[in-house]
Amino acid sequence: MKDLFSPGSLLTVAGAVLTVIGSVAYATDSPNVSLPTIFYGIPIFLGGLALKSSELPPPARLTPAAQFRELRESTGTKEQLKLLKDVVRWRYGQKAHLESSLEALKLWDEENPPQLQSIAEYDHGGRYALEMVFDLGDVPREHWHEKADRLGRFFGPGLEASLEDGEADLLIVQLRQPCP
């Protein structure tokens, strides 16, 4: 359902509708309607198709946005909030969410990069925390475990990362503030 409302889909549909209206108007000899709608419709349609071909949908959000709003606003760090905001939106022209971050951490494979499958918010001892599930791609699980200490520091001062092995090629990364 969320694929239906991506910006690429909306532009494609809008451009197609304008093009069809312009074509029908042209066929019925209504030049005042046909020219503008065709001239605007075709570029919008092509732009929508271009966006559609390069879009990366947001990962599944396992917890409703409203569920941890109060905890997020009171104890969430600005880095956690920025990370959440960054991954729950549509991306264009990238192979994976957090592409530049994973490249900087040397957790990237150009052919088959790690893919963020889902993100969840949770309460960790009264503190706001994020849990991300990655499909590892061709990056060995051992590389992730070697970088566990660096992961927390990379995403923000005072954050710690906890890694849990999931089933098959999945890895669960928890970013949280240490409990006092």
Annotate each predicted stretch with a short phrase:
Residues 1-69:
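N-terminal alpha-helical membrane-insertion module
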Residues 56-74, 92-128:
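An N-terminal amphipathic alpha-helical segment
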Residues 71-88:
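Cytosolic juxtamembrane regulatory segments of multi-pass membrane proteins
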Residues 82, 108, 116, 136-137, ...:
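N-terminal low-complexity, charged segments
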Residues 83-92, 127-132:
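Short low-complexity stretches enriched in small and charged residues
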Residues 89-96, 136-142:
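Short, surface-exposed ligand-recognition loops at beta-strand->loop->(often short) alpha-helix junctions
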Residues 122-180:
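Cytosol-/stroma-facing membrane-proximal "stalk/adaptor" domains immediately downstream
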